[in-house]
């Protein structure tokens, strides 16, 4: 009896559940269930005449389809402006092509006069020395080292001299200190140089070969 009642309700309004009154998807599982059951009971109604309007109502609207695959959203995900933001800034490129850091003691150096070099700070020269020490081969290394004169120079960025230091280092001194730091790191990484080594310096190629 309940099945008959449910079918009578459903065929009159086939797009809503006969009991819960919730919307039913056209040709969905619930729809097919009642369609089959009511046909077996011989209960048919005007549901077929309502199906075209129901399909039209339930189909995604053009606005919804446009929203899901909106060209503007795709453009946002692969926006040229975002790619441009990730590229190096002009200021970064200027820094890469800026004047070289000079850590010598010659005020008449050609690079200083023509603007291709600038006198480095203590810390800049310390960093430059570390880089040079890392890039040069270690030809000899003594595990036992104690300076005869320990200047205890300061090569940091602070403007106040630490209590453990005697004085501020000059650019040349700080580069030398950095070079020793770089050489020690190079030795820890790869040890002494074992074979020939060639490099370019001031337009000249230099080569080092083992004596034996």
UniProtKB/Swiss-Prot annotation:
Disordered: annotated span: 42-101
Bias kind Low complexity: ranges: 58-91
Family, as annotated: Belongs to the IIV-6 378R family.
Protein name per Swiss-Prot or TrEMBL: Uncharacterized protein 100L
Annotated source species: Invertebrate iridescent virus 3 (IIV-3)
Lineage per the UniProt record: Viruses, Varidnaviria, Bamfordvirae, Nucleocytoviricota, Megaviricetes
